[in-house]
Amino acid sequence: MAKFNVLDHNLVPEHHIVPEEEEKNILKELNIEKEFLPKISPNDPAIKALEAVHGKIKEGTIIKIVRKSPTMGHSVYYRVVASEVFK
């Protein structure tokens, strides 16, 4: 079976790993604590695709998602990798 990188599909938004150095600034800007960010499963196909490039992504890592928007050009969302909500 051929492997397919979901991040290459035009309907899948860009996913980026947020460097640890930037996490504090993002959380401060959003006025939120990391545990209150929406969650993304470590088994999500986009996370698996990022792991193929960057290696294992640990829980607690913040993922930046950039979605194309017809009204705003693009919109940015943040998710934290966490499996406890998906059990």
Curated annotation (Swiss-Prot):
According to its UniProt record, the EC number is: 2.7.7.6
One MF annotation (Gene Ontology) recorded for this entry? DNA-directed RNA polymerase activity
- In Pfam terms, one family for this protein is RNA_pol_Rpb5_C
Task: Give GO terms for biological process.
Answer: transcription by RNA polymerase II; transcription elongation by RNA polymerase I; tRNA transcription by RNA polymerase III
User: Hey, what's the signal peptide range on this chain?
Assistant: none
**UniProtKB keywords:** Cytoplasm, DNA-directed RNA polymerase, Nucleotidyltransferase, Transcription, Transferase
Its primary localisation, in coarse terms, equals: cytoplasm
Q: Which family does it belong to?
A: Belongs to the archaeal Rpo5/eukaryotic RPB5 RNA polymerase subunit family.
Role summary: DNA-dependent RNA polymerase (RNAP) catalyzes the transcription of DNA into RNA using the four ribonucleoside triphosphates as substrates.
What is the protein named? DNA-directed RNA polymerase subunit Rpo5
Originating organism: Thermoplasma acidophilum (strain ATCC 25905 / DSM 1728 / JCM 9062 / NBRC 15155 / AMRC-C165)
